[in-house]
A protein has these predicted regions:
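C-terminal cap/substrate-recognition subdomain and adjoining C-terminal extension
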Residues: 36, 172, 184-381
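Alpha-helical substrate-recognition element adjacent to the catalytic core
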Residues: 2-201, 205-211, 323-381
Length: 381
């Protein structure tokens, strides 16, 4: 959708400073959460690892290793003329601080002990955020909600900011459905832990969550992609795109409460971890009742290395879709998760949603078209 407002892009030599609020934080505060009022139903698709969990069951990474590895993806440098790595910023940021910068991870791949070796200058960021992740002192470990780190200390398994998001959504009187979307094997455990927290008040920081009256569908679903079709299954439900994707869009939009689906890692890997093999997301710019928002740390502005495949309907009620680039939906329906800020700022998820809602409404009002243009490299992070 057309967007006449201009967002200032950082100059090439500007580094986004790391503050206590996380990656790329600025002096100015985030936009406020909108006042309660009638809005589109929110369908929130939320990744698990490095989005609301600081661990990775697929790669068997614990809390320290997962956070250490994440830092290698948000710290930037380049190879100099002598063929040696040269750091371009002492700050961590989701976007490159200048033209030509590449992340350490993109250049060298995963390196165990990144902040104890070449990334030692970022060790302070690691330690600061590990402290923020600590399980409350004096509170007994919980088999589902806490996890013992490699250093023997207890940490939150699910970020507290996720539970704060649930509080905020209910207090704002939003109509919403929250769907976990993961390639990994943690989904059953997450659904169980969240259900117990919402029904039994098991979380020491959020004992009042049962008052929210939210339901959790603990049956893990699956979304399987092939050249022929996309098939969604959950329990006895089965929906296919064989006759068009509209049925899948309507199924996801009709949900309530919380649930989750395991997506197809092999399909993404087969497509070289690019947009075309990513987790499918259908968006209908003609639907006045629903807005889909997808949080994932692996959403990238480069479609050759991003994790969500957005498909936009071309006409009202139709079946035809086109693939949208990440930049078209960035901060409208796609949010590149800032793990450091999600750890340090309890209102992070709610503010990101508010930004997406604001951008969506502006774009609809300015042209009736959904898609934004050039929203990439914004400073809202």
């Amino acid at each position: 959708m057309a967007n006449s407002q201009t967002t200032r892009v950082p100059e090439p030599d500007e580094a986004l400073e790391v503050t206590q609020n996380g990656v790329g934080s600025e002096d100015r505060p985030d936009p406020p959460v909108p006042a309660p009022g009638p809005r589109r139903k929110l369908i929130l698709h939320i990744d698990l690892n490095n989005t609301i969990l600081v661990s990775d069951a697929v790669t068997c990474l614990g809390t320290l290793a997962a956070l250490d590895g994440f830092l290698s993806t948000v710290t930037w440098g380049k190879m100099n003329q002598k063929g040696k790595w040269e750091w371009l910023s002492d700050a961590a940021s989701l976007i490159p601080p200048c033209e030509g910068a590449i992340s350490y991870y993109s250049q060298f791949g995963r390196l165990p002990g990144f902040t104890s070796g070449p990334g030692r200058r970022f060790r302070g960021i690691l330690d600061e955020h590990l402290d923020l992740l600590r399980w409350p002192e004096g509170i007994t470990a919980d088999k589902e909600l806490s996890v013992k780190g490699e250093d023997g200390r207890l940490y939150h398994w699910i970020l507290p900011s996720f539970f704060q998001l649930l509080r905020d959504l209910v207090s704002r009187e939003d109509d919403f459905c929250l769907l976990f979307r993961t390639f990994g094997s943690d989904l059953p455990r997450v659904l169980s832990a969240v259900s117990r927290t919402l029904t039994q008040g098991a979380h020491p920081l959020f004992p009042d969550l049962p008052d929210l009256k939210l339901s959790v569908n603990q049956t893990p679903g699956k979304i399987r992609c092939s050249k022929r079709e996309v098939v969604l299954t959950r329990g006895e439900d089965k929906v296919s795109s064989l006759n068009g994707p509209r049925d899948l869009y309507q199924y996801l939009g009709a949900g309530s409460g919380l649930g989750g689906f395991q997506d197809t890692f092999d399909w993404w890997s087969k497509h070289s971890c690019s947009l075309m093999g990513g987790k499918p997301l259908w968006v209908d710019p003609f639907d006045p009742t629903v807005q889909h928002i997808f949080f994932d740390d692996n959403i990238r502005q480069n479609d050759k290395e991003t994790i969500v495949h957005p498909m936009v309907f071309l006409e009202r009620g139709g079946e035809a879709v086109r693939t949208a680039s990440t930049c078209e939906l960035y901060d409208v329906c796609l949010v590149q998760n800032d793990l450091l800020k999600a750890i340090s700022d309890s209102g992070y998820f709610s503010r990101r949603i508010a930004i997406c809602q604001e951008n969506y409404e502006k774009n609809v009002q300015q042209g009736g078209d959904l898609l934004g243009h050039g929203r990439c490299t914004t400073e809202n992070h």
